[in-house]
């Protein structure tokens, strides 16, 4: 429900459109950006590292700066739509991990300019799909969305655990990282228990602050890097000339379909967990259109696709802070981080273990939101079959990837599905939703007593 009050009050953080004092809004917006900042940059370093010929450190630094700028702009469009592009919901956008595998393959085989060309085409493909959502929206039934949201929550557990242990650094699992993650997690929990009023919703920011300070004392933060790179630096448009290869484009477009499923799930979870209502068709259409066309814009700045960030969906579900102006302050901080290297360097210096301590609870919240959505759909025979079978196949088959269970399938199928539980759950749940009879409930047979003569 949209807030209608014009009064500027902190209580409006729980309303979509209420006015919030800037000084009160900034901490909540900043909390969102801190939560996703490193995850927004990591895919670029992985994809750029796989590129042949290799990208220079200067080029990678430029792409990281561009990614911050693009993520902020894309978030603003989700919050305040342009025409039919944008959902008008508090969705935070960032560079997607979903594309890392396929884009790393494209970068290694065709070169980084081919990544840009494939993302340009794929983004237009998803954006157009979003604008035409009213023609295919009914295929995505509520039980499909609910099951996908549950799968998204599950798929993020390993991401949170990886961050908790220190990310992809050589000291993964070290005692220092485990202490950092634990202290951050406990701080979030204690703040959530003992803080009063609206301050209770700043538990993640409190955890990040305490964890960051502890990381400084443990020498896990290099403060000298914060002022490196100058004071102001404008994003670079078209740093690479796009190249187009049919094989790369087809592979990336397939992953855009998977990303669409995740976006539908994220948007549904945000509306259900943050606004306590069912999602509307225009919101799905606008969200997907923004995902797609913003990804094409991202490619123009040399970056991979952007999409909704599940971490922030979990944060909204946990705090119920849905105010668009509040989230906008975070988007502005992201844009500033792309224009002011010291700001971006500060955010980028957040240790993975600190982020992991904050994300574990939020990722669990996403999964619980999915279960709640399934419960709202009802536990009849049909819904139970769709949810149970799609989750069993999705989790089971992707967990067994190392056992070569996917080896009989073509390479493109392995790339899309072998390690992507959300993609498998989405496809299986769609198929089951289309082919299963509408009424599968077991009917009781009433026996008529016949008097024996």
Regions found by a protein language model. Name each.
Residues 106-224, 331, 336-447:
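Membrane-embedded alpha-helical modules
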Residues 22, 48-88, 253-324, 452:
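Membrane-embedded helical hairpins/re-entrant loop segments and their flanking transmembrane helices
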